[in-house]
Amino acid sequence: MTSQDRRITKTRKAIYTAFLQLLNQKNFESITVQEIIDLADVGRSTFYSHYESKELLLDELCRYLFHHLFEREENISTEAYLTHIFSHFKKNQDHVTSLLFSKNDYFLRQLQKELEHHVYPMVAKDLQVSYPNIPTSYLKHFVVTNFIETLTWWLKKGKSYKEDQVVSFYLDVLEMK
């Protein structure tokens, strides 16, 4: 790694860390680029050479969080996959809780898209067989919103439960177990 690469990495890390720190203190909408650059100790032009806006910084944060989160092995069980997702959220809860609890629209929309794409297909067939008269769009909405609410509850109040227990609660509510 060249010294320039290290400087770029160090600068991006400082901006990212400052942004996360601010997200833990206040909601996204009230954070200014000025606050980010002050806390990161970088210049405005430096910030804008890395990110066009705080929204694109948030987008990168979401992509970073979701990249490993939703990766899965070929023949993994639904329970094991969901346990992996909950474990990942717990491991990254410093980054996630502020976005989740602030009800940040962008973060929630991205999370919903990922859940619709990765989680819903794993439970769709069983739900459609069990509830053939319920529209697919409703079932998808039910699976996704219940996942987000279960995650929110667990991170706020249910920390005494292990990931696999929370997955059991979630699947029991979906009547998948």
Task: Name what the model sees in each region.
Residues 1-26, 35:
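Basic, helix-initiating cap at the start of DNA-binding domains
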Residues 15, 34-39, 47, 89:
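Append "Primarily bacterial transcriptional regulators
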Residues 41-50, 147:
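Short hydrophobic/aromatic patch on the recognition helix
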Residues 21-24, 31, 61-85, 96-97:
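Amphipathic alpha-helical linker/stalk segments
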Residues 105-149:
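Amphipathic alpha-helical packing segments from all-alpha helical-bundle domains
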Residues 87, 153-177:
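C-terminal peripheral helix-coil segments that are non-catalytic and often amphipathic
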Residues 15, 30, 42, 53-58:
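Short amphipathic alpha-helical segment with a characteristic S/N-K-E followed by hydrophobic residues
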Residues 77-123:
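Helical hydrophobic small-molecule/effector-binding pocket
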